[in-house]
Regions:
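Conserved core of the sugar-phosphate nucleotidyltransferase
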Residues: 7, 172-253, 259, 267-275
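ATP/Mg2+ or Mg2+-diphosphate-binding catalytic cores
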Residues: 310, 315-318, 597-638
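An alpha-helical support segment within catalytic cores of ATP-dependent transferases
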Residues: 319-334, 437-492, 496-504
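ATP-binding pocket architecture of kinase catalytic cores
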Residues: 340-446, 460-468, 482
Length: 638
C-alpha cells in the first residue's frame, strides 16, 4: 500500500464513509486520488463495497499502531549555554513544566506508556522520571564523544512501531496518536538554511546541496515495519564503525547501495547533502515526510529561544545572566546573541552582546576549583589593571571565578613558526617582566608537580621510569635555586594561544595600533602593521623567575632544542648568558613534567591530549640531559 491508501484507511478506521468528496476534504487529498485508493483498498479486501473497513482493514491499522517511544536526552546541549551549566536541556521548564515531562504527558494521553529515555549528561537528574512516570532509563556513557546515533543504537532492539523524539522540542498541540498508518519524519513548511532535506511532490525527503534551503527538520519520527527493520540494521552497523561516531541518528534513515563500504560515512550531519549518493548512500530518506505547521513546534536550542517562548521561565534566571545584568547595568532581555565558545581546556565560556557591544563570559569548568585559586587570579588582575597588558575584566568574581571581558574582533593568536610574531611576543613578554609587578602568592613548580601527582589518588604514573625522571629533576633543584633570579609577577601560561594580535576599532584604536607598530621591529610584515598585542588568560600567574615564561612558551609550541634556543635568543636579543640558558633548559624539563602530570590527571577524568601529553614527558627527560650537557661544557656542577 502507498501512503495515500494508508491515510484513507486510517480515516475510515475512525469515521464512517459517506462519499468521496467528503473523504477528499477531510484527508486533504484530491478526489481522483481518493477514488483510485478506494478501488485498491477494496481489491485488497481492506474495505467492503460500502467503504467500511473489513476486519482485515482494522487489523492492518492495529498492527501499525504505536507501541513505544524513545526520547533522546543524552547530549550536553552545548548551544543552551549558560543554562546547560546546571540543567540538562530536557529538564528546562516552559510554563512551569519540564520539556521532557510535557512530552511524556502527551504520549500518555495517547495511551503510550512504554517510554525509554536515553540519558548521559547529568544522567542523575532523570532518575525521578522512573518513579513518577514509569519510564525506562538507559545510560549512554559515551555521550561526550559520540553523537545521538550511538544513543539510539543502544536501544535499537526496541525500535518497532516507535516514536523517536528529541528532548528539546516543545509541542503546542499533541503530535502523537493512538494510530499511525506509516513511517514518517517530521518537518515543517518553514524554509530553513540549516536543513539538509526538502519535501518533493511525492512527499519524499530528498537531500539538498549546501547552497540550498530546505524544510525545517523538527526531528520527531515514527518508525513501523519495514522501515523500522532497516533503521535497526543501519544503527547496529554504523555504531560498530567509529567513522559514524559524530553522526546524528538521522543518518540511519538513508538506505545504502549493496556495494557501499563503511568509508562512505564522510558526512557528519543529518542527510549529509548530495555527496552521499556518490558515496553509496541514496539521495533521499526511506521515510515519508510529515509536514506540520511551524507555529505548533518550537525547538529550544538556545537561551534566547527559551526566552522568546517563555520569558518567565525559571531557567532564565541563572547566576551568570544575573552577573551580566549587574555588571553591565542591563536587563535580561538586553543580553542577546549568546553562543558557546569551545576554546579552553579548563573553562566553559560563552559570547554575548549587550548594549551594542560584545563580551565573553568565562565560567570555570568542573573541577577547576581544585586547580586554580580564583582569589589569587583576581589579585593578579588588580596588579596588571590599566597597564595595557590586557583588557581589564569588566567583572570578576573571586568566589566562583566568573569573569566578563570585552570581546576582541579581528583577533589572531601567535604563530609559533612566524619569526615576526615571535619577535613581537618576546618584546611584549620582556616589557611585562620589566615592570617588576608583585602579588602575594607564588607559583611553585615543584609544589605543582607534587599537587597534580596527588590527584592521581595513589595510582602510579603511566610512565615506567617516572620515579627516575622525577629524581633526576629533583637533583637539579638545589642548583637552579642557587642561581640569581629577579623574581616578579610571571604569567606562567605565556603560550602562543594567549598572545592575541588584534585590530582595534575606531580612530583612537587605530592611533594606538600605529604607535605600537612603530615601536615594533622595522621588518614587520606589512600585513601585520596596525595590530595591537596583548596577553590573556592570567589564571596561573604568580611570583616566579620570569624566565619560566620562556620555558612555557617552548613546551606548549612543541619546540625542539634548536627552536628553543632561537626563542631564548629572541628574548635576550642574542645576549643570553650560558648559565641563564642552562637555567631555562632546566625550567623546560621541570615544566614538562608538571604538565605531563596535569595530563595524567586529566586522563583519569577521561580527557586525552594526544601527542601533547607524551611530548611534555619527553621534555622532562630530553632537557634534563641537555641541561647536564651544557653544565658540563660550562664547568657547572649540580
Amino acid at each position: 500500500m502507498n501512503t495515500y491508501e494508508l491515510e484513507i484507511l486510517e480515516k475510515l478506521y475512525f469515521e464512517t464513509f459517506i462519499n468521496q468528496r467528503i473523504l477528499a476534504s477531510s484527508t486533504g487529498l484530491s478526489v481522483g486520488v481518493v477514488n483510485r485508493s478506494l478501488k485498491q483498498l477494496a481489491a485488497d479486501g481492506l474495505i467492503d463495497k460500502h467503504g467500511q473497513l473489513t476486519e482485515k482493514g482494522r487489523q492492518e491499522i492495529r498492527q501499525r499502531a504505536p507501541r513505544n517511544a524513545v526520547i533522546l536526552a543524552a547530549g550536553f546541549g552545548m548551544r543552551m549555554v549558560p543554562i546547560n551549566l546546571s540543567t540538562p536541556k530536557a529538564l528546562i521548564e516552559v510554563g512551569g513544566e519540564p520539556l521532557i515531562e510535557r512530552t511524556i504527558r502527551q504520549l500518555h494521553e495517547q495511551g503510550i506508556r512504554n517510554i525509554t529515555v536515553v540519558a548521559g549528561f547529568m544522567k542523575e537528574s532523570f532518575e525521578y522520571l522512573m518513579d513518577e512516570y514509569g519510564v525506562d532509563l538507559v545510560i549512554n556513557p559515551d555521550y561526550a564523544s559520540k553523537n545521538n546515533l550511538h544513543s539510539l543504537a543502544l536501544v535499537a532492539d526496541r525500535i518497532s512501531n516507535t516514536y523517536i523524539i528529541p528532548c528539546d522540542i516543545w509541542c503546542a498541540r499533541n503530535p502523537y496518536s493512538a494510530t499511525e498508518p506509516y513511517s514518517w519524519y517530521m518537518v515543517s513548511e518553514l524554509v530553513d538554511e540549516d536543513s539538509t532535506v526538502r519535501v518533493n511532490r511525492k512527499r519524499e525527503l530528498v537531500t539538498i546541496s549546501d547552497k540550498e534551503a530546505g524544510n525545517s527538520m523538527i526531528g520527531i519520527s515514527y518508525l513501523t515495519e519495514p522501515e523500522a527493520g532497516i533503521v535497526r540494521e543501519n544503527l547496529r552497523r554504523m555504531d560498530a564503525d567509529e567513522a559514524f561516531d559524530e553522526d546524528f541518528w538521522e543518518k540511519a534513515l538513508y538506505a545504502r547501495s549493496a556495494s557501499a563500504a563503511s568509508a562512505a560515512s564522510a558526512a557528519k550531519v543529518p542527510g549529509a547533502h548530495s555527496h552521499e549518493a556518490r558515496n553509496g548512500f541514496k539521495d533521499r530518506m526511506i521515510l515519508q515526510a510529515k509536514v506540520v505547521s511551524s507555529s505548533d513546534f518550537v525547538e529550544i536550542d538556545t537561551y534566547e529561544q527559551l526566552r522568546d517562548l517563555d520569558s518567565d521561565s525559571n531557567h532564565l534566571k541563572t547566576d551568570s545572566i544575573k552577573a551580566i545584568c549587574s555588571a553591565l547595568n542591563c536587563k535580561e532581555n538586553e543580553v542577546t546573541d549568546i553562543s558557546v565558545l569551545k576554546k579552553g581546556m579548563t573553562n566553559r565560556s560563552f559570547l554575548f552582546s549587550a548594549k551594542g557591544a560584545k563580551y565573553i563570559m568565562r565560567i570555570p569548568g568542573e573541577g577547576t576549583d581544585q586547580l586554580i585559586n580564583r582569589r589569587q587570579e583576581a589579585d593578579v588582575y588588580r596588579a596588571i589593571s590599566g597597564l595595557g597588558l590586557c583588557d581589564d575584566p569588566v567583572y570578576i568574581n573571586p568566589e566562583n571565578g566568573y569573569k566578563i571581558t570585552a570581546f576582541l574582533d579581528n583577533v589572531r593568536t601567535c604563530d609559533p613558526d612566524n619569526l615576526d610574531d615571535l619577535r613581537r611576543c618576546m618584546d611584549k613578554l620582556r616589557e611585562f617582566h620589566s615592570m617588576h609587578l608583585t602579588v602575594d602568592h607564588t607559583f611553585d613548580i615543584f609544589g605543582q608537580i607534587d599537587f597534580y601527582e596527588s590527584l592521581w589518588d595513589g595510582n602510579p604514573s603511566i610512565y615506567r621510569d617516572y620515579r627516575k625522571t622525577k629524581e633526576n629533576l629533583l637533583a637539579l633543584r638545589p642548583y637552579v635555586e642557587s642561581l640569581p633570579k629577579d623574581c616578579c609577577l610571571t604569567h606562567i601560561d605565556a603560550v602562543p594561544d594567549n598572545f592575541l594580535f588584534y585590530r582595534p576599532a575606531g580612530a583612537a584604536g587605530a592611533a594606538a595600533a600605529a604607535s605600537e607598530a612603530a615601536s615594533a621591529a622595522q621588518d614587520l610584515d606589512q600585513a601585520q602593521a596596525g595590530e595591537l598585542l596583548q596577553l590573556t588568560d592570567w589564571e596561573y600567574a604568580g611570583m616566579q623567575d620570569p624566565h619560566v615564561d620562556i620555558a612555557m612558551f617552548c613546551i606548549y609550541s612543541l619546540y625542539n632544542r634548536q627552536q628553543c634556543d632561537r626563542l631564548i635568543d629572541l628574548y635576550f636579543d642574542g645576549k643570553c648568558e650560558p648559565v641563564t640558558r642552562i637555567k631555562i633548559y632546566i625550567y623546560i624539563a621541570m615544566c614538562g613534567l608538571l604538565w605531563s602530570n596535569w595530563c595524567e590527571y586529566k586522563r583519569k577524568l577521561g580527557l586525552e591530549f594526544g601527542e601533547y601529553s607524551l611530548r611534555q614527558y619527553r621534555y622532562a627527560k630530553d632537557f634534563y640531559r641537555a641541561a647536564k650537557e651544557l653544565m658540563e661544557a660550562e664547568g657547572q656542577n649540580a
